[in-house]
Amino acid sequence: MICAVYKSSRKQETYLFVPKRDDFSQVPEPLLQMFGTPLLVMLLPLDRKEKLGIADIDKVRSELAQKGYYLQLPPPKDNLLTQHRRDLGIED
């Protein structure tokens, strides 16, 4: 299975995986409006991959089969103040 991966023109580190290049027919319109113009990053052979960067490859495959798309959001940002307080042993 080969899928197309697009990055968002509006949201940093946000990617949309679809089963066919330039086929956004299964992606909800509100999501596409929020996503902005999809910019093709790569065509990805999922059947040859065992791992992806931050996405769970089994979840990507499953959502592509069930929903027709997979949306990868950026990882949560670390709260540096909370981390510093934890390092100092200060609890909230």
From Swiss-Prot:
Question: In which domain of life is the source organism classified?
Answer: Bacteria
Kindly give the Gene3D superfamilies that the UniProt entry links to this protein: YcgL domain (3.10.510.20)
Q: Which InterPro entries match?
A: YcgL-like_sf (IPR038068), YcgL_dom (IPR027354)
Describe the location of the YcgL domain by residue ranges.
1-85
Q: Which Pfam families match?
A: YcgL
The name on file for this protein is YcgL domain-containing protein Sama_1929
| Originating organism | Shewanella amazonensis (strain ATCC BAA-1098 / SB2B)
